[in-house]
Amino acid sequence: MTEAVVIVDMALHSRIVDSAALNPRVASFAEPATESPMESRLRMLLVLGGLPRPRVQVPLFDSRGLFVGRPDLYYPDHRLAIEYDGTMHRDRLVEDNRRQNRLISEGVRLLRFTAGDVLRTPETVVSQVRTMLVLRRGVG
């Protein structure tokens, strides 16, 4: 299922296919805003791991209405952002760090994962996200 969703996400994002032409089960998991196959795999790992479906590529703004960032995955009720860091992110480290600082200064918690995390230790990824979701529920 995950690999089917990866393909569909990329086809929708590239506007190669319309969602009306998709298998309904696969379409129910599809997210055309997803920007990479590993983001799709990370999202599906969380959903198939029993976690709520995160929102994808949500623009976030500070209290003055200024753009802060657009995390790959986001749980708005928990103010939890999740980023997939691919190999090309090493070249953008400075900007990623600045965006992370802006998000944190606005009260958004942030988790970052790599391909190694998603593919080699998926249980740890799900567990860490689950813990952050539970922790936020207990606040306030």
Q: Regions from the language model: what does each represent?
A:
Residues 1-140:
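Surface segments flanking catalytic/ligand-binding clefts of nucleic-acid enzymes
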